[in-house]
Curated annotation (Swiss-Prot):
It is found in: Cytoplasm. Its cofactor is Fe(2+). Transmembrane segments: none annotated. Binds 1 Fe(2+) ion per subunit. This is tRNA N6-adenosine threonylcarbamoyltransferase. Fe cation binds at residues 114, 118, 305. Coiled coil: none annotated. PROSITE patterns: GLYCOPROTEASE. Gene3D superfamilies: 3.30.420.40.
Length: 339
């Protein structure tokens, strides 16, 4: 098989990233310029600030990706870029840069769905992973459980009806005074708490409906905190976040396991920033082992937004001849499976 070397660019939120990926599974470089320190003081991502920082960083990030990979533009077979979903201003920075490169170098342009990229991160760390399998996508903006039928072909089994899991983590973290980003801080503090101390609600729909809802548990936490403050009672933050985390993790795990049973799948892959959560990993591994289901995780660097996952997804699009036109535009509300 001829090697296909792809230069990939990701700028959908607050990471400016570029990577060089070979045949969808071998990463020669994966450079990420994070804005997390900038947005922390605002308590969350400020879209306009994110866009400006992408503009400042993108050229240097791409140059570093090429240098670390030991390749030049002449070695690149295609340019890949995230075009949605995400913050429209942030997306446009990466997209316009990639289009400029593709045009000037006369290379194919491949637009990639950001969520599909998260799923494809598993192909990098698990070289023998092939469809079909179930994937649980859990991030700050998205929560899906999908059946991956083939490369680039997905059946959405369940999705969030309101807050994404990562969004709920951020809001609860802010409420208890942990700040941003909430996911890692809750994960760390929860280890010191009793996850059975407080019974927070879990949204369970009918057996054949595997959608998610996290607004209820988020509101329950906020109500609990308000009541404790009104009574002037001491709040054990570790117990609060541990109990909240348990409620979220159990719903995520239950729906992933049920999807495996529904589609007769024996593999679950996890994707997205919340895939780094230690409680989620432990619970899924434990429940999967009970049922003979193999549970796969990307390495932490591939759970967060990165360009290597975009390069992986782009490779399989390239094999199918899915080349984007120069008229490709940013789609902030792009859904999984849409083009």
């Amino acid at each position: 098989m001829n090697k296909k070397i792809i230069l990939a660019i990701e700028s959908s939120c607050d990471e400016t990233a570029a990577a060089v990926v070979v045949n969808g599974r071998e990463v020669l470089s994966n450079i990420i310029s994070s804005q997390i320190d900038i947005h922390t003081k605002f308590g969350g991502v400020v879209p306009e600030v994110a866009s400006r920082k992408h503009i400042e960083a993108i050229n240097a990030v791409v140059e570093e990706a090429l240098e670390v990979a030991g390749v030049t533009f002449d070695d690149i077979d295609a340019i890949a870029v995230t075009y949605g979903p995400g913050l429209v201003g942030a997306l446009l920075v990466g997209l316009q840069y990639a289009k400029g490169l593709a045009y000037s170098l006369d290379k194919p342009l491949i637009g990639v769905n950001h969520i599909e990229g998260h799923i494809s991160a598993n192909f990098i760390d698990h070289k023998d992973l092939e469809p079909p399998f179930v994937c649980l996508v859990v991030s700050g903006g998205h929560t899906f459980v999908v059946h991956v039928e083939d490369y680039g072909k997905f059946e959405i089994i369940g999705e969030t009806r309101d807050d994404a899991a990562g969004e709920a983590f951020d809001k609860v973290a802010r409420a208890v005074g942990l700040g941003y980003p909430g996911g890692p801080k809750i994960d760390k503090l929860a280890k010191e708490g009793n996850s059975d101390a407080i019974k927070f609600p879990k949204a369970n729909f009918h057996d054949d409906n595997l959608d998610f809802s996290f607004s209820g548990v988020k509101s329950a936490v906020l109500n609990y905190l308000n009541k404790m403050e009104m009574k002037n009672e001491e709040i054990n933050k570790a117990d609060v976040v541990a109990s909240f985390q348990k409620a979220v993790v159990e719903v995520l795990t239950d729906n992933a396991i049920k999807t495996c049973k529904m589609r007769k799948a024996d593999k679950i892959a996890i994707a997205g920033g919340v895939a780094s959560n230690s409680a989620l990993r432990e619970n899924l591994l434990r429940e999967g082992e009970k049922r003979g289901i193999k549970v796969l995780f990307p390495s932490p660097i591939l759970c967060t937004d990165n360009a290597a996952m975009i390069g992986s997804a782009a490779y399989f699009e390239l094999l199918k001849g899915n080349i984007s036109k120069m008229s490709l535009n940013a789609k902030p509300n792009l859904r999984l499976g849409e083009r």
